């Protein structure tokens, strides 16, 4: 996208990249749409990328999470498996997606956080009630994420373009002709 926010692209993707299995998929799709990505990781997970900006944050509990939230803005896309990060991103008006492809929304985030809390509580309560961890990631999981992520990216891009067109239609251009200002509304269609 050509529009800028303080010298930066208006829509950006921020990835909580510590042990994120879908970084390659995110980069492939984002590059297709020319959307910039920032991969955030701590000093224990050094990443390299030919497309994304890699931001290494000092080690510490939730250091990456807090940095990600401090730099994302309304309309950005956040990729994280952390429900707390997703909730904070939604609170800032950003879009959030899990590495499984599930979209976090204001309608489902509270229930997801409650389920996580109950599962954590059950794991701590007894060894007899041991809840297994997640299954090994499959190729189908990657396909599901790619489809869901691209759908989100297209939706965000469409909203951005619609907002840009609305703003341009409401602009008035002024021409100076023989020292007289003439107001002419912009009626051209934006592409």
Question: Where are these predicted regions, by residue range?
Answer:
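Short polybasic linear motifs
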Residues: 166
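Intrinsic-disorder-associated, low-complexity terminal segments enriched in Asp/Asn/His/Tyr and depleted
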Residues: 163, 174-178, 186
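Short, intrinsically disordered C-terminal tails of secreted or membrane-associated proteins
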Residues: 182-190
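Nuclease catalytic cores that cleave nucleic-acid phosphodiester bonds
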Residues: 2-163
